[in-house]
Amino acid sequence: MIPFKLDMDRVQLDDWGTPEDIGAHTVEGTPLVSGKILFGTLSSPVSGGLYAATHGRYRVTYPFDEHATLLDGQLALTDEGTGQTVIYGPGDSWIIATGTTVIWDIRSDSIRKSYLAVTPTSAPA
């Protein structure tokens, strides 16, 4: 079991660089991203862990399905396909489907989330 509680000490994350280093595109500011995979690997069909980003805005098209819960900070996520914007704070969660393009607007100095990512696999022939 890997617990994520709002009042627990935070795990040290690894520097992942800029949004461009993870396949996103910076829209505003100079955000930096970091994280730690705690379950599975980048090549696993299912992985999970922690992710953080600093103040700024970036666009990403999700290559996986994700369920995430914000642990720290405040951000707005905008689904570019529908135009829906939702503001999240600590304890709030979301689900994003593969192929969805989202604008991340980090409104606090930084955010941290826990996540579970599921990469779609091709159906057998």
Please report, for each region that a protein language model flagged, where it lies by residue:
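Short acidic-glycine-tyrosine-enriched beta hairpin
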Residues: T82-T98
